[in-house]
């Protein structure tokens, strides 16, 4: 029983959805002014809903991608490929989790959050995984919006008040996703070519790929400091965020100068925790 639970848990790709849950929880926390019992319960509701939705989406996309997962070295050990989980069971598991994520929000009358949840799941499962992943090199741009929705789901689970802050955080996630995915895809471009998945990095030259990825990193930095100019964050936040971004910007320049897998890996390694660090900064400066 325990091994089966562990198998299905791993099937949902926790390394992927854990960051989505993290940014969603941050989105919920920055929306409140004080930690009352009601607010804590609302944060818990947001956390559970986002976790179930993210797990369900990843499980369902695993079902959709099972044929190409069998071709790619990086993914050929996933449960549907190895036969540890039957495809139909994997599909139902994902659909049930996604359904529960929306039902929970509706049960607690968090209608706007439920709408954003439905849109995010649709974008991830249908727009990205089913419709565009195998058809266009810009698939991650069209499907990347789903990654930003946990922030606004978290925010609008605890409050109905409008603010520019959650939408800036939403934009940060959406901009960060191509950097993260493309820099990883650049390293595994042979895998994507073998599976006939037209990722931007697998069909463009090394130079163009490096420019696209590095430009995204620069845009990410710019967006990370924009909240200051809307008075959503203090100037001290901008100073700290700029200092933290320097290594990422340096690696971006080096990647453009010498586009190879080693440079791509360095950018991937640093940009991976960058988003989480920025969100922690937002949380800290929110309550300072």
UniProtKB/Swiss-Prot annotation:
Part of which pathway?
Porphyrin-containing compound metabolism; heme O biosynthesis; heme O from protoheme: step 1/1
UniProt-listed InterPro entries: Protohaem_IX_farnesylTrfase, UbiA_prenyltransferase, UbiA_sf
CC annotations in GO: plasma membrane
Primary location recorded for the protein, binned into one broad class: membrane
Q: Which CDD domains match?
A: PT_UbiA_Cox10
- Compartments where located: Cell membrane
Whether Acetylation counts among this entry's keywords is no
Q: Which Gene3D superfamilies match?
A: UbiA prenyltransferase (1.10.357.140)
Membrane topology type: Multi-pass membrane protein
Write out the catalysed reaction: heme b + (2E,6E)-farnesyl diphosphate + H2O = Fe(II)-heme o + diphosphate
Molecular function in Gene Ontology: protoheme IX farnesyltransferase activity
Its EC number(s)? 2.5.1.141
Q: What else is known?
A: Carbon 2 of the heme B porphyrin ring is defined according to the Fischer nomenclature.
The family annotation for this protein states: Belongs to the UbiA prenyltransferase family. Protoheme IX farnesyltransferase subfamily.
Q: What is this protein called?
A: Protoheme IX farnesyltransferase
Q: Which organism is it from?
A: Thermoplasma volcanium (strain ATCC 51530 / DSM 4299 / JCM 9571 / NBRC 15438 / GSS1)
